[in-house]
């Protein structure tokens, strides 16, 4: 639960940001925090900053805090920053020397508490500064109390958020409590507010307060702080301290951690490997044991997803921080294999969260909040994987109830635990405009089907197997690829390998290979084996390491959607190619800074390294088994449970010998490229003996019967299942009924400072204060009040991308807006602004005009005789997703658009709603 460590990176300062607060290239430690997450893709953690220092404490850590701002300034945050040297770390501890102040800092962690030791320079007055406001995400409120008699500092911070800058800690809120006990008396103490320092004041509350305690320079030069946290209450923090760090000194705490770490290492024991490989192996295993982490206090209490206090049974844990879209692929199976008792607790936590949240299984949890990050429904896949790979103590009846209920009900607005677009998905077989989420839904459905079959629910097993086959509806028969479809069944353009439209964190070619439950059927629809081998070889040449490569139609080894792509070669009769690729990918992991090809995403990437190095990979979600690719390391013992040990032995293993020459399982020759977990676990555990070599053994594993299974092909589908009829589309029909009378200029990421509203005297809205914008429907518009959307004509642009306080958008995308200018006026130009980080920035609408005095009916289906004239047909999608978009609509020959009182925007059906920030109308 606690994870103390250094913080030296904020909000893209320096051009590159670490979302967890530490970057090896940074030269100064800003402060230390009590919480961190491992390799998370968005800013999280970084709670309760503190910093030891020396001197007169003349700098305020909150002086620059602006009213209404959640985050303090960079200057404030770095008020007591220091350059550093002599960093050292091990399992559960960290040490560093702060060069500017000369302070040696040592941190050691227990589950809910920590010991911090500060060795101050001789004859210098040391102090420790506490500043909750300098949380990387900002805070809403905080409280600090100093107890000089008891040598304690305690308090809490209200924070939250899970995003890139700018931050909003009011979203996904939580309160974190702390208490810190010192072994030296306070010579001085006080607090800071934005107005300045107040010595001798023992308490402060607010979003911009800090506290300090100072020590006698003539006394002990070494001061120890014992600190604990709680998400329940202040008493919980005190009890956690008493149960853990208060009972031990630093050597004893480290000894206990070392003993536990060695036990964990024994579950995945490595021998005979070079030291650098051992460091990478141990580091990746360590990262996979950090999350999900304990969230309950020592007395078993925890704050649930309903924000109420609950208690787990004795010996049980409530886990927090699941990056499920990432971790179901690798971390979940690994944890079920090597820590099955804890993995069972993680599954039980998911079931508790579902019950407390009133919904289904969680998706991406941060503490006791569901972030709904990454969409899809991966909770079902993770739970099925935990069960399939051996997690212990899971109530299968409760799991079955939650899984089926969640998979068969629509997700309620602003909650989680159901399937988004469920009605469309069940009726049509795909989620409109999202190929990647359809593919992910299929994977979850397949895992659900396997689970239902396990518990004897054949009816739902067949239902979910049929749903899992709907990826077939996204395969373009002529272009031989997978793309998204619109709600009417038409294809979502463009149909190119690099398009990201309809794909999450990837493009069409990256997601093409992602049908792990039915890879053989996928390949049969994409071309001949010879053509596919060439296409797949080109996909990996070159493969991409690091950076953001979502729009590049190549293998991106640092991101999850392509994690299983190398193993497709096993289905094409060339497993030796997969062996080479997996060895090359594993070689991108090093024991230095930046030693991982992408975000770790709470263990997902590091778990893939462990599986790659073992020569086994859990390719098919929900199925307890592995694709075989050949180990990189010579001697691995994987203990599944007491008395069951899988032994992996690989002669000549290493980066220069990536190819399997032969394999025996328990002494018998084995040529298949798949092995079941049941086989590995039988009779006390199997022994896999590989002979590795520098040249491919093309005869091994290359027969059709050697290929891995493709269990999704078991379902019998009706004739014509893959055919998708294209329905009538009102938006498309209306487009065809008019001839736009305008010239349209489209810009992406323009310099909005030079185009910011208002237009001045040319802005008709400034001359027509009675101008209004009304929502006609058919869908509600976020940002509307009683059908009006004044924020779209208030002369104010958005402050940043994805700003819901300044933007308005239709749920589902389809809707109509009418602007009434009060009088018929000459309109020379219409400007439309939008701003969003993702696929809601592009603008897609039809603009119509009508004269007064009475507004024609806006809900028309036939333009002829409607009273409306089509002025513009706008689609800025070709500019790409993300950023700021501006559309300028003017007369074709530089003249006016015409004389109009009413302007009508029609947005298309089943589109995600554009984040409009402002609509402007200019006159002569």
Where are these regions (language model features)?
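Short, surface-exposed tryptophan/glycine-enriched loops
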Residues: 882-900
């Amino acid at each position: 639960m606690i994870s103390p460590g250094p913080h030296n990176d904020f909000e893209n300062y320096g051009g590159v940001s670490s979302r967890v607060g530490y970057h090896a290239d940074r030269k100064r430690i800003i402060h230390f925090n009590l919480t961190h997450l491992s390799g998370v893709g968005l800013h999280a953690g970084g709670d309760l900053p503190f910093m030891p220092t020396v001197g007169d404490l003349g700098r305020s850590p909150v002086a620059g805090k602006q009213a209404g701002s959640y985050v303090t300034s960079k200057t404030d945050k770095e008020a007591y920053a220091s350059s550093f040297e002599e960093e050292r770390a091990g399992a559960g501890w960290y040490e560093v020397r702060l060069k500017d102040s000369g302070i040696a800092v040592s941190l050691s962690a227990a589950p809910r508490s920590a010991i911090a030791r500060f060795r101050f320079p001789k004859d210098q007055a040391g102090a420790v500064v506490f500043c909750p406001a300098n949380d990387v995400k900002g805070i809403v409120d905080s409280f600090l109390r100093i107890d000089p008699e008891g040598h304690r500092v305690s308090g809490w911070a209200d924070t939250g958020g899970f995003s890139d800058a700018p931050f909003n800690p009011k979203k996904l809120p939580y309160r974190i409590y702390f208490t810190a006990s010192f072994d030296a008396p306070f010579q001085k103490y006080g607090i800071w507010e934005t107005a300045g320092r107040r010595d001798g004041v023992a308490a402060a509350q607010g979003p911009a307060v800090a506290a300090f305690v100072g020590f006698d320079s003539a006394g002990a030069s070494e001061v120890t702080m014992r600190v604990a946290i709680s998400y329940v209450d202040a008493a919980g923090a005190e009890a956690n301290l008493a149960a853990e760090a208060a009972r031990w000194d630093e050597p004893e705490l480290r000894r206990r951690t070392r003993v536990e770490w060695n036990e964990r290492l024994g579950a995945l024991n490595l021998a005979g490997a070079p030291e650098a490989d051992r460091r990478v192996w141990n580091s990746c295993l360590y990262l996979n044991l950090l999350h999900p982490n304990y969230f309950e206090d020592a007395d078993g209490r925890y704050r649930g997803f309903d924000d109420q206090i609950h208690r787990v049974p004795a010996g049980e844990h409530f886990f927090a921080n699941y990056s499920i879209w990432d971790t179901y692929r690798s971390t979940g199976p690994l944890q079920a294999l090597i820590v099955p008792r804890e993995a069972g607790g993680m599954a039980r936590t998911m079931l508790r969260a579902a019950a407390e949240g009133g919904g289904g299984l969680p998706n991406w949890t941060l503490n006791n909040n569901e972030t709904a990050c990454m969409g899809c429904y991966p909770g079902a896949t993770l739970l099925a994987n935990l069960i399939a790979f051996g997690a212990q103590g899971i109530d299968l009846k409760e799991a079955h109830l939650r899984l089926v209920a969640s998979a068969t009900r629509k997700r309620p607005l602003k909650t989680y635990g159901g399937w988004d677009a469920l009605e469309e998905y069940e009726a049509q077989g795909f989620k409109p405009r999202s190929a990647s989420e359809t593919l992910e839904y299929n994977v979850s459905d397949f895992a659900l089907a396997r689970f239902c079959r396990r518990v004897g629910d054949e009816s739902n097993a067949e239902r979910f197997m049929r749903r899992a086959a709907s990826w077939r509806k996204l395969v373009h028969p002529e272009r031989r690829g997978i793309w998204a479809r619109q709600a009417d069944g038409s294809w979502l353009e463009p149909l190119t390998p690099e398009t990201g439209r309809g794909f999450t964190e990837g493009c069409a070619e990256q997601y093409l290979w992602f049908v792990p439950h039915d890879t053989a059927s996928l390949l049969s629809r994409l071309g001949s084996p010879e053509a596919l081998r060439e296409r797949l070889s080109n996909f990996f040449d070159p493969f991409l390491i690091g950076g953001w490569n979502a729009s590049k139609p190549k293998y991106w080894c640092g991101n999850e959607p392509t994690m299983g792509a190398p193993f497709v070669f096993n289905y094409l009769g060339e497993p030796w190619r997969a062996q080479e690729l997996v060895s090359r990918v594993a070689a991108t992991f090093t024991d230095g800074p930046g030693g991982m090809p992408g975000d770790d995403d709470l263990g997902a990437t590091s778990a893939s390294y462990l599986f790659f190095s073992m020569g086994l990979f859990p390719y098919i979600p929900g199925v307890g088994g592995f694709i075989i690719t050949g180990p990189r390391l010579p001697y691995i013992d994987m203990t599944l449970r007491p008395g069951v040990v899988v032994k992996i032995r690989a002669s000549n293993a290493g980066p220069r010998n990536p190819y399997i020459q032969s394999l025996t399982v328990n002494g018998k020759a084995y040529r298949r490229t798949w092995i079941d977990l049941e086989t590995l676990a039988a009779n006390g555990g199997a022994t896999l003996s590989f002979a590795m070599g520098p040249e491919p053994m093309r005869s091994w594993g290359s027969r059709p019967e050697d290929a891995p299974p493709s269990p999704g092909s078991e379902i019998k589908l009706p004739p014509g299942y893959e055919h998708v009829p294209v329905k009538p589309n009102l938006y498309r029909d209306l487009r065809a009924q008019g001839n736009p009378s305008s010239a349209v200029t489209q810009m992406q990421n323009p310099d909005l400072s030079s185009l910011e509203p208002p237009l001045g005297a040319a802005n008709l809205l400034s001359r027509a204060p009675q101008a209004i914008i009304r929502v006609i429907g058919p869908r509600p518009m976020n940002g509307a009040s009683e059908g009006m959307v004044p924020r779209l004509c208030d002369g104010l642009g958005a402050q940043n991308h994805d700003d819901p306080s300044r933007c308005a958008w239709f749920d589902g995308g389809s809707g109509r807006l009418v602007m009434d200018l009060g009088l018929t006026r000459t309109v020379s130009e219409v400007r439309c602004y939008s701003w969003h980080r993702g696929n809601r920035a592009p603008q897609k609408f039809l603009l119509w005009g009508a004269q007064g005095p009475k507004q024609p009916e806006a809900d028309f289906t036939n333009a002829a005789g409607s009273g409306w004239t089509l002025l513009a047909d706008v689609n800025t999608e070709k500019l790409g997703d993300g950023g700021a978009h501006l559309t300028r609509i003017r007369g074709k020959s530089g003249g006016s658009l015409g004389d109009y009182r009413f302007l009508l925007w029609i947005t298309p059906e089943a589109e995600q709603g554009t984040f409009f920030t402002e609509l402007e109308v200019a006159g002569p």
